[in-house]
């Protein structure tokens, strides 16, 4: 069974191998130098694909790939450090996200922006830098970045407060299917924030977000439907 798993792992990593003992298979994997392949091996250990989950091994392989400049591995290291998977290493989160972000990794740009919003992961609070990073993600069409940029305009964080621009961004992300933005668009129509009140539009957007399981959208949908029945 273990031999079969190792052969499957070699296949996942893109290595063609004939039958061999486990130690030989491990030895072949250890000789892998391609960073993209190293990252895929890390994914196997991180996600429990083919082999049992092993955080230490996942990190070891991600680090091998990240040290060679693999943006995906750098992003994954940042994610692990951010979510406390590595005790005492959280300050490294921003470092790894930044390395990936500088290579154009859109999700890493977004996550680094989150750290700047919170003043966490090895960086101090800097709303202007968060906005810059969210804007990069938004320009690449990443819905989460579009939504967060909208929130920055809504709250006046790092940019002058502009509810009209916030609505435009929320609407854009909502049309991409992002539930939190759908909910916010519903709120805009429900409350008349910079747009004409429109309960039907509010219901439509609340329902879209509720259909994706967003609790607050379910609550507002239920409330608005009950009000319309009176």
Residue ranges and their predicted role:
Residues 40-47, 76-83, 111-118, 123, ...:
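Hydrophobic face of amphipathic alpha-helices that form TPR/SEL1-like repeat modules
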Residues 1-4:
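Positively charged n-region of N-terminal signal peptides that target proteins for export
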Residues 30-35, 47-49, 67-70, 83-85, ...:
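Short helix-capping/linker turns of helical repeat alpha-solenoids
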Residues 10-17:
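Hydrophobic h-region of N-terminal signal peptides that target proteins for export
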Residues 19-23, 52-61, 85-96, 123-133, ...:
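Structural signature of tandem alpha-helical TPR/SEL1-like repeats
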Residues 21-24, 28, 208-230:
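Terminal, low-structured helical/coil segments at or just beyond the last alpha-helical repeat
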Residues 18-49, 64:
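N-terminal segments that cap or nucleate solenoid repeat domains
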